[in-house]
């Protein structure tokens, strides 16, 4: 048995303007090549565009979008007797939020156009309404888990 203690979970810091952890999670995931100031610019422009499009609180739209995309269950590949099975596994809220942020950004990057702030704002608004690629990804994951429910005992 290991004598080491378990590492403390790091709490996500909040961003300087909105004091919101979700915004900071988005910033850290959108970050490329260490350009954090550019990541902040993209996120803040996207938030302003959400404000203009919906004329509601953009942070509530962000929260609603992430809540809509967050999966409850996912599948993990597990090897049993020479064959690999997709085993459905429930995931916690923190991991679910991380997946949701990743899926939202991936769906935003896939959208046509050049301006990332515009693409991200459009994806967030769509996700808050219950449509968009990120929502489709969540539904696809849930379908996979449902289809492989027979392998749930392999956990």
UniProtKB/Swiss-Prot annotation:
What are the GO BP annotations of this UniProt entry? translation
Q: Where is this chain's protein located in or outside the cell? A: Plastid
Q: Name one GO cellular component term.
A: small ribosomal subunit
- Pfam families (UniProt xref): Ribosomal_S7 (PF00177)
MF GO annotations: rRNA binding; structural constituent of ribosome
InterPro entries for this protein: Ribosomal_uS7, Ribosomal_uS7_bac/org-type, Ribosomal_uS7_CS, Ribosomal_uS7_dom, Ribosomal_uS7_dom_sf
Keyword terms, alphabetized:
Plastid, Ribonucleoprotein, Ribosomal protein, RNA-binding, rRNA-binding
The answer to whether keyword Ribosomal protein applies is yes
Which PANTHER family does the protein's record reference? RIBOSOMAL PROTEIN S7
What is its quaternary makeup? Part of the 30S ribosomal subunit.
Similarity section? Belongs to the universal ribosomal protein uS7 family.
The free-text function statement in the UniProt record for this protein reads: One of the primary rRNA binding proteins, it binds directly to 16S rRNA where it nucleates assembly of the head domain of the 30S subunit.
| Protein's name according to its UniProt entry | Small ribosomal subunit protein uS7cz/uS7cy
Source organism:
Cuscuta reflexa (Southern Asian dodder)
Record lineage: Eukaryota, Viridiplantae, Streptophyta, Embryophyta, Tracheophyta
């Amino acid at each position: 048995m290991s004598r080491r203690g378990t590492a403390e979970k790091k709490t996500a810091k909040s961003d300087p303007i909105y004091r919101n952890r979700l915004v900071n999670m988005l910033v850290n995931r959108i970050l490329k090549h260490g350009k954090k100031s550019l990541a902040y610019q993209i996120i803040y422009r996207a938030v302003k565009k959400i404000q203009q499009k919906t004329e509601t609180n953009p942070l509530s739209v962000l929260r609603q979008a992430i809540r809509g995309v967050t999966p409850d269950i996912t599948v993990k590949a597990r090897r049993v007797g020479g064959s690999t099975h997709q085993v459905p596994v429930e995931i916690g809220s923190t991991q679910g939020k991380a997946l949701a942020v990743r899926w939202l950004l991936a769906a935003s990057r896939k959208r046509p156009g050049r301006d990332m702030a515009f693409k991200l704002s459009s994806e967030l608004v769509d996700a808050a309404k219950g449509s968009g690629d990120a929502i489709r990804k969540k539904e696809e994951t849930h379908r996979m888990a449902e289809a492989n429910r027979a392998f749930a005992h392999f956990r």
